[in-house]
Amino acid sequence: ADREIDLNGDLLMPAFKNAHTHSAMTFGRSFSDDLPLQSWLYDKIFPLEAKLTAEDIYHLSRLAFLEYLESGISACFDMYYFPEAMAKAAVDAGFRTVMCGAVNNFKESPALLEEYYNTYNNYHPLVSYQLGFHAEYTTNRSIMEAIAALAEKYKAPVYMHASETESEVQDCMGRYGMTPTALFEQLGLWNYGGSAFHSVWVSNEDLDIYKKHGVY
């Protein structure tokens, strides 16, 4: 070898990458963690998130980034609010972040998503931004259609939560007569790929859709 490093029994390897994070949610550790997802979100988390400021997000995100680095993680794919605070926290920590839109019925908008996309893909070498929204059950059809139009405009992938619980899938079937996965495909959200975070309750047909569009 051209170079040898004596690690005294330790391992030298490439850093880990965390592919789905909500870094600023360091505030929610062990908070009502005995509840079903929907109750936890609507009764506990969403009310708290409504009170968070950009300054809060900066400090909460920076705490997470420092912990990631300590754990051997050098980059994350982060879905949350106040990207200006998230981006600054990442740069200040020397951490690589790919931010993702978190649009829903009560926070952010497709217009703001497009603004963020153009701003934070030209912000700093450690920062980039992808199109995204929270989930089918928090985002109405018109918003999803507008995001699909952005995906087509920029030839960009789209990221969201999908099929995390059985009730989420059943409720979507009641609203649209199809699974979240089938709906997202119908709307053209994955014409350029993307991801469906969690995907616990998926059918074989859903998996075929993922394979077709390179969704992971």
Residue positions per predicted region:
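Metal-coordinating catalytic core of metallo-dependent amide/deamination hydrolases
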Residues: 85-203
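Fold-independent oxyanion-binding glycine-rich loops
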Residues: 7-8, 60-61, 79, 134, ...
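A conserved active-site cap/scaffold subdomain adjacent to cofactor or substrate pockets
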Residues: 202-205, 210-216
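Hydrophobic/aromatic beta-strand patches that form the interior of the parallel beta-sheet core
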Residues: 3-5, 17, 98
